[in-house]
Amino acid sequence: MSKTAPKTYITSGHSGCAGCCDAFAAKFTLMGAGPNTIVINPTGCLEVMSTPFPYSSWQVPWIHSLFENAGAVASGVEAALKALGKKDDVKVVSIGGDGSTMDIGLGALSGAFERGHDFTYVCMDNEAYMNTGVQRSSGTPFDASTTTTPAGKVSFGNPRPKKNMPAIMAAHGSPYVATTSIGFPRDMIRKVKKATEIVGPTYIHAQAPCPTGWGFDTSKTLEIAKLAVETCLWPMYEMENGEITQVRKVKNPRPVEEYLRAQKRFKHLFTMEGGEEEIKKIQAIADWNIKHFELQ
């Protein structure tokens, strides 16, 4: 990548929270995709904070889709561009949160990938429904406390493992699937650029820590994102035609306790009886990632 940073096409002045992860994710996505891009953005934090009527922070064509149909709208945009003979000159990128991607909009997204539409989908995974009050999604990690899975006398928080969305999208026959993190801007920009240059449905899954929903200082967003990677709870890799082709190595993984202790959504693990055993379970997830993805 050039030492000169590519131009971004989303402006300041939006109403995102201090330290907003979605602002970073949108910025890096457009730095990778470039100016000749049409964005489809389902309902969520990014849509709400970037387009308060009658204003917009977007400097590229932007479409607000429903929570559930970003994949269908992207399919229609791509088909229309093909019919007009303009698809080779314009990139179609959908940017959605984990709720619209992994839950509410999964059916439409699956259909778009199964049909082979030529577009890139970027999931900004802040691991809960932040826009509506920090409710659990299928992207919420094990033992995280949310407003619908609160930690208490009978629960350590979310009882279910995080859905493996990259594997699901790879199973659709996608030519390119990658994970990344807003804590590594160059990595995210490079992967988005690569994804948008490949013909066919491509998928980027980016972790995007939310200070409001996760409970950490607003100045620590990128630091927390890096810590997720350094503890191996967020492996970064690329898959081409279903095969892992590149992995970001972690030479000296840090204990997951450092990552968990930095967030209020996991604070109960350090105060409740039995919390130590739960931390060991989360460490086992990181250890599995190290072995499965060959992170060392």
From Swiss-Prot:
Cofactor note: Binds 1 [4Fe-4S] cluster per subunit.
Keywords in alphabetical order: 4Fe-4S, Iron, Iron-sulfur, Metal-binding, Oxidoreductase
Listed GO MF terms: 4 iron, 4 sulfur cluster binding; metal ion binding; pyruvate synthase activity; thiamine pyrophosphate binding
Cofactor dependency: [4Fe-4S] cluster
One Pfam family recorded for the sequence: TPP_enzyme_C
Catalysed reactions listed for this entry: 2 oxidized [2Fe-2S]-[ferredoxin] + pyruvate + CoA = 2 reduced [2Fe-2S]-[ferredoxin] + acetyl-CoA + CO2 + H(+)
UniProt xrefs under InterPro entries: PorB-like (IPR051479), THDP-binding (IPR029061), TPP_enzyme_TPP-bd (IPR011766)
Superkingdom classification of source: Archaea
Binding-site positions, [4Fe-4S] cluster: C17, C20, C45, C210
Disordered: annotated span: 140-159
Enzyme Commission number: 1.2.7.1
Residue ranges with Polar residues bias: 140-150
NCBIfam families (alphabetical): PRK11865.1
Subunit structure comment from the entry: Heterotetramer of one alpha, one beta, one delta and one gamma chain.
Other remarks on this protein: It also catalyzes the oxidation of 2-oxobutyrate.
Protein name as it appears in the record: Pyruvate synthase subunit PorB
Organism lineage string: Archaea, Methanobacteriati, Methanobacteriota, Stenosarchaea group, Methanomicrobia
Chain's gene name: porB
